[in-house]
Structures are given as C-alpha cells and as structure tokens.
UniProtKB/Swiss-Prot annotation:
InterPro entries cross-referenced by the UniProt entry: PLipase_A2, PLipase_A2_Asp_AS, PLipase_A2_dom, PLipase_A2_dom_sf, PLipase_A2_His_AS
GO cellular component entries: extracellular region
CDD domains named among the record's database cross-references: PLA2c
Superkingdom per UniProt: Eukaryota
Provenance organism: Aspidelaps scutatus
Name this polypeptide is given: Acidic phospholipase A2 CM-II
Amino acid sequence: NLYQFKNMIQCTVPNRSWWHFADYGCFCGYGGSGTPVDELDRCCQTHDNCYSEAEKLSGCKPYIKTYSYDCSQGKLTCSGNDDKCAAFVCNCDRVAAICFAGAPYIDDNYNVDLNERCQ
C-alpha cells in the first residue's frame, strides 16, 4: 500500500524525504500523462503501469493492499506474501524504490506545470 511504499522509499533513499517524490515530473504522484521528464519520472511511470497490471488480478487494490517485506541496510526483500496480489504489489513497490535510489533527482522537475510539460 502507499504507506508501505513510502517506507520502502525511505529504506532505499534515506537522505531524501519521501514527499520529494510525491509531486515530481509527470508520473510521480497522483495520475500521470504525457512523456516522462527524466529517469526518475520513468521509474514512476513504470510503477503506475505495474499497479495497473496488479489491478487486473481478482480483487487486487494496490493502493491499499498490505504486504510483508524487510528492509536491511538499504536492501528490500518481499517476504511471505502467499497471496498473489500482495506479492505482486510488493514487487511493484520494491522495484520502484530501487529505481528511485539509482536515478538522479533534478530539483527543476519537482512540482512541474503538468499542463505545460505533461501533454
């Protein structure tokens, strides 16, 4: 779920608050359209698409689905998720959090004008 995703981000990117990712580019945060502005925004587009795939699983609601995972020294592991939805959503969030850690953060792409840059 989104709370766990926030915690995963704090695991892989401990030196930057999770809310820096909540309104970044065209895809990080609510909704998403246009072309990603950079590598970090592409991480978010991929995460959005992953959630869309998760929603195709019967009764799977990725924004609120809880799952089990471990964070150890910046390494994330999804664990003990017997149900398909939990395992899928955990992996969506894990892959995105790792992607965030590897992508440059460009301050100019925070809080962009969606109408101007995301058509």
